[in-house]
Amino acid sequence: MSLIRKLKPGTISLVLGPMFAGKTTFLIHCINMLERLEKKVVFIKSTKNTRDKTIQTHSGIQLRPNQCKIIESAQLSDVGSLTDTHAVVIDEAHFFDDLIRCRTWADEKKIIILAGLNASFEQKMFQPIVRIFPYCNWVKYIGRTCMKCNRHNACFNVRKNADKTLILAGGSELYITCCNNCLKK
């Protein structure tokens, strides 16, 4: 079934995976498809994500200026009215403690597309993802190759430093992804 058939009004789609797997690239692809269908899209970015001021992937792919409305917020409850919006796209969904708010938008017949990490650097699922998961109509897992051995599927996010803060935004300067074999080494 094609992706566009899965993105229906009133549905919640969730894309999970480790860092550097292409989740934001997938979201940009969805936005491009929705734009071709003349849907009004709102992209919500967490203020906890201090990595970039633009909507950009780790590989440098960016949303075009004015491609969709971009809202930066600490909580989804602060976003305000989305009455003229067809689709809500949320990157780094695990950053939003009130991610369950997406159910209300789905009840308003909006297309909801979420992307987030499969687990923290401690290999534990983020609670916002756990709470929204039962309400998702479609879930996609995107993997990547281990950054240590380049042989196996990496599903673990590993922090390079000893900082124990749960939310610490960063890229390859702070994190790598690795497979189960390399995690145990």
From Swiss-Prot:
It comes from the Viruses. InterPro entries: P-loop_NTPase, Thymidine_kinase, Thymidine_kinase_CS. ATP binds at G17, P18, M19, F20, A21, G22, K23, T24. The keyword Ion transport does not apply. The active site is at E92. Phosphorylates thymidine. ASFV replicates in the cytoplasm of infected cells and contains genes encoding a number of enzymes needed for DNA synthesis, including thymidine kinase. Important for growth in swine macrophages in vitro and is a virus virulence factor in swine. This is Thymidine kinase. The lineage of its organism: Viruses, Varidnaviria, Bamfordvirae, Nucleocytoviricota, Pokkesviricetes.
